[in-house]
Amino acid sequence: MALSLVLSIVMAAMNAGCSAGSQRAVPEPLAFGVLGATCEPQRLAALRGAGVSIVELPVAWDRFEPRQGRVDSQYVADVVAQLEQCRQAGIKVILSPGLHYPPAWVRELPGGELRGSKGGVSRGSGAELIFSSEVRKAAHRYLSRLVLRLGVDQGMENIAAIRVGTNSSGELGYPGPDDGGNEREFWAFGDAPQKGTGLAEGVALSPMPGWVPGSAVWNGRAVTGRQVHEWWDWYAGSAVEAVVWQVKALRSLGYQGRVHVPVAGRGVLPADKAKAVAGHLDGRANPDGAQERGLDYLAQFAVLSMVPGVDVDFTGLDDVSAAAARSTVPRQDRCSPGDEEKAVKEDVSSWSSQRYTSALARRAGLGLVGENPGPPDFPFTGGSSLSDSLAEQLRTAPGYAVDCGMTMFLFGFEENLFDDGEGGVTLDDYKEVIQQSH
């Protein structure tokens, strides 16, 4: 069944007041964790004493398999040791397999890099899991080795979730609009999506091969709004299909636990999408580059709702949009009862990203977890001069998580809790926040 048809069926059901494959868990007390864990025993003891019960452990594909077919046994042993240390400390683990850290040889595979609409190649992008058959084969082999080794040495019982995504930050979506050195670049212009050469099994070819967003003509004829809409559905749908592929790959390898899909921002708002389609995706109604990133959460969450065991991980609790929405009258930063319907029926342009995206996840029946962006001056955190400081994020973000119905809050990052307060926060600060939540 074509992905666009799946979207139509699920969206029709949701708009009728139900959610397909609803899997939202009964609300439970908020669990607290950290991102970027080392699983170092002394730190684990301190974290557990503060009330932390879960950590995110990053693994790097390029370190696991630096050469094609050659596994770094010492690195694997180190990861296994980290997991064992967490298990002994009574701390659950969210595993990040690190597909967004592909080895150089993966990028050299046929179709190994995403190609932009202006000829660019994304700098530092993750593995090209969206369209490339060869990259997906390599990724599946890597995941099978990772899961097999962890299953043999550790078992998977202490792994609370595995994170999956498609971009260089490990989140859902394509690279940013400027990641290839050009302005406003879309990312589906390699031979696989345009010609079918090396296209992954089950992935659709572009519905308008050769058409570039912004152009009013294709094959000598005027482009219709319907054609642009179909192209957008294909573009955004291909990104979420790559996430579904990863979940299915993990299931086929025997992992049956929760899967977290990190998402940032609020994606393209429905009203903005209508304007963008009318303008042939020429850049209008695109305030934050969500179009080029292919983020259409209303439709994409509908697809994820059909996959059992999936939680949305919102990565920007108390991001810059929350700081702005907090200052409006009335304030629009906090999640509120009834947001699930308001999100699709009212003007939500003044809402914070966390409020809008959480409402869509709840509407789709998906589980919800969240994390703060991290230090505003760190790369990939979306920080600006208007962002809250790390200390302000620690004070504010957990409350947002509760308001939005999340079951878990992950603080970014572990290192910032053990840097003697250089980042403005300490583990004692986090402990106080956790104690106040109970």
Question: What is the meaning of each model-derived region?
Answer:
Residues 4-15:
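Bacterial N-terminal signal peptides
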Residues 29-36, 61-76, 122-141, 225-241, ...:
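The substrate-binding groove and active-site-proximal loops of carbohydrate-active enzymes
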Residues 37-62, 81, 92-94, 301-313, ...:
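Catalytic domains of carbohydrate-active enzymes, especially glycoside hydrolases
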Residues 121-303, 310:
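Polysaccharide-binding and catalytic clefts of secreted carbohydrate-active enzymes
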